[in-house]
Curated annotation (Swiss-Prot):
Belongs to the multicopper oxidase family. Induction: Expression is positively regulazed by the cluster-specific transcription factor pfmaF. Residues 429-440, 562-576 have a biased composition (Polar residues). Cu cation 3 binds at H125, H416, H472. The gene is PfmaD. One of its GO terms (molecular function) is copper ion binding. InterPro entries: Cu-oxidase-like_N (IPR011707), Cu-oxidase_2nd (IPR001117), Cu-oxidase_C (IPR011706), Cu-oxidase_fam (IPR045087), Cu_oxidase_CS (IPR033138), Cu_oxidase_Cu_BS (IPR002355), Cupredoxin (IPR008972), CuRO_2_Fet3-like (IPR044130). It comes from Pestalotiopsis fici (strain W106-1 / CGMCC3.15140). Its EC number is 1.-.-.-. Pathway: Pigment biosynthesis; melanin biosynthesis. This is Multicopper oxidase PfmaD. GO terms for biological process: cellular response to iron ion starvation; melanin biosynthetic process; reductive iron assimilation. Residues 426-445, 536-584 are annotated as: Disordered. Cu cation 2 binds at H81, H123, H474.
Length: 584
């Protein structure tokens, strides 16, 4: 069980009359052999160890990570999930969006301010690496925590699906024309605390804050702490009014902070709690459901841990019904509406993809932020960004994002750079938004929301964070299928945006443009002839051991064949691809 222990070099600086630390971490990203569920496989670790270490900071601290890529055969990078990166958009870590990936043998420094408290996590946002292990908790503590004094200690509880094969093989097997059911890789099991200790020490008469994170690539999880209630105090790093519930559903990417207590009646007992993988239509359920795990709330270290927790029916609390602690009212009036219709699709090679508005995200040659920073006033024109499904809003705009889920399954969607208000999220089968629904006057805020099958969700933000931010499904396999769009926020304030020279040099070293439109054209930024529009027919990535010769060939997005239209040919009324690199 992770504890709130800070392992770093801390330098004190005075900020606005208070003391803040600079948390400096030196990380070497390496392959490590691990067996969290008893099956040995290569995983991506830090400084020769796995699980990857937690990061602990306090509001106002500066977090600095000096990262060296020693994988030998794969580019990498770090994204800090839930951190809004105000004024540091280039640190968001999404490959070819905010920066270029970091090649083997080279280094990159990430630096950002821990400006908002909460439970976050970091992970690779490059080539589906985080299911291979590159992920860890990021906790920002609050000296002014409104729940201070209501708990005695805290622990971290991570949950994840787990695969015995490496990501490269899984994605290669998924992106084939014979996969006509759009079947994602199915996990071989689940792990809690990355295969570590699942027990939570809970002394009689005390309350523990449990920080729950779902690191999964595909599945949501159900959680119940035995016969006792849990009090939710935070959702996705947003304080909420204390809500007493019995069961919780945690989607991929989501986090919950809950309080769990032990009373005198628990003396001498070790109380079982149950985590179960959410039943999903992609699974063939056998007679015995094996994807669950029992942990214990330990009130007596000498007492046996033999009792089992049985749940007859999962009925979790609705994640869209929490009330923000500050009771911030619904944003409005609206300035813009961004409607995204999500559905399954296929590309011109009959390979299964996923589409917003009949289009799939295609990674471009120039990082999208670099385009916004270098094309002048043209950065307000969506056409200069290529096939990244761009949507542009001005500073101060109130934006409503409407996502119509045309698929019968539940999908978790995540927005970088913001905590959005969940205006409305109807039950499954409600159909697409018809404009007639009412809004929650005091909506909860979070950065991942599960959208029910055959239904929709409405989300609102104020454009107060200039930058380039992805909006995507947080099922990692669906990101690889292309279920991503791009928010270009306040481009009028991004012209000439100052990007660290080290990041520019990293792009140049790989042959990527650092200025101009999506193709790197600085002369005629409206010339789309060099844009990438085709989904690659092969997927290249990493697999251990490192091939002979050390570093793999430099991977580059595929060029559009000469004379081909800038729009991908549609099959089944769909098109496109996402961020798969090919070797040429």
């Amino acid at each position: 069980m992770w504890t709130a222990r800070l392992s770093s070099i801390a330098v004190l600086t005075q900020v606005v009359g208070t003391w803040a630390d600079t948390i400096t971490l030196n990380w070497e990203i390496t392959w490590v052999n691990a067996a969290p569920d008893g099956f040995h496989r290569p995983v991506i670790g830090v400084n020769g160890k796995w699980p990857c270490p937690p990061i602990h900071a306090t509001v106002g601290d500066t977090v600095v990570i000096n990262m060296k890529n020693s994988l030998g055969n794969q580019t990498t990078g770090l994204h800090f999930h839930g951190i809004n990166q105000l004024d540091t958009n280039y640190m968001d870590g999404a490959s070819m969006v905010n920066s270029c990936p970091v090649v083997p043998g080279s280094s990159m420094t990430y630096s950002f301010t821990a400006d908002e408290p909460g439970t976050y996590w970091y992970h690779s946002h490059n080539m589906a690496q985080y299911p291979d292990g590159l992920r860890g908790p990021l906790i920002i503590h609050d000296d002014n925590d409104p729940f201070d004094g209501e708990f005695d200690n805290e622990v971290i509880l991570t949950i994840s699906d787990w695969y015995h094969q490496q990501t490269l093989t899984l994605v290669q097997n998924m992106l084939v024309s014979s996969n006509d059911q759009w079947r994602p890789p199915l996990p071989d099991g689940m792990i809690v605390n990355e295969g570590g200790n699942t027990d939570i020490e809970l002394d009689i008469g005390t309350t523990t804050r449990v920080r729950i994170l779902n690191f999964g690539a595909l599945t949501a999880f159900m959680l119940r702490f035995g016969s006792r209630d849990m009090d939710v105090i935070m959702t996705d790093a947003s304080y909420v009014q204390r809500e007493t519930i019995h069961q919780l559903r945690i989607a991929p990417g989501q986090r919950y902070d809950v309080l769990v207590s032990a009373t005198k009646k628990d003396k001498g007992k070790n109380i079982p709690y149950l985590i179960s993988m959410d039943l999903n239509r992609d699974f063939t359920v056998s007679g015995t459901w094996t994807f669950n795990q029992t942990g214990y709330l330990i009130t007596d270290a000498k007492a046996p841990c033999t009792a089992k927790e049985v749940v007859q029916q999962w009925r979790p609390f609705d994640e869209a019904l929490f009330t923000p602690l500050d009771e911030m009212p619904l944003l409005g009036p609206l300035d813009r509406t961004w409607t995204l219709n999500f559905a399954l699709c296929k590309d011109m090679n009959n390979i299964p993809r996923m589409c917003f508005n009949d289009q799939t995200y295609v990674m471009q040659k120039t990082p999208t932020l670099y385009t916004a920073a270098t094309v002048g006033n043209a950065n307000t024109d969506p056409s200069v960004y290529g096939a990244v499904l761009p949507f542009i809003i001005e500073y101060g705009d109130v934006l409503e994002i409407v996502i119509n889920n045309l698929d019968p399954a539940i999908h978790p969607f995540h927005l970088h750079g913001h905590q959005f208000q969940v205006v409305e999220r109807p039950e499954s089968g409600s159909g697409s938004f018809d404009g007639s629904s009412t809004a929650n006057p005091v909506p909860p805020r979070r950065d991942v929301i599960s959208i029910n099958g055959g239904s929709y969700a409405r989300l609102r933000i104020t454009a107060d964070n200039p930058g380039v931010f992805l909006f995507h499904c947080h099922i990692e396999w669906h990101v690889e299928m292309g279920l991503t769009a791009t928010l270009i926020e306040a481009p009028e304030m991004l012209d000439g945006y100052d990007i660290p020279q080290a990041m520019i040099d990293s792009c140049k070293a790989q042959g990527y443009p650092v200025a101009g439109n999506a193709a790197g054209d600085t002369i005629n930024v409206w010339d789309d002839s060099g844009y990438l529009t085709d989904p690659p027919s092969t997927y290249s990535g990493s697999q251990w051991p490192v091939p002979k010769g050390g570093n793999s060939q430099k991977s580059r997005p595929r060029r559009k064949p000469s004379g081909q239209s800038s729009q991908t040919r549609q099959i089944s009324n769909m098109s496109g691809e996402f961020q798969h690199r090919i070797t040429w």
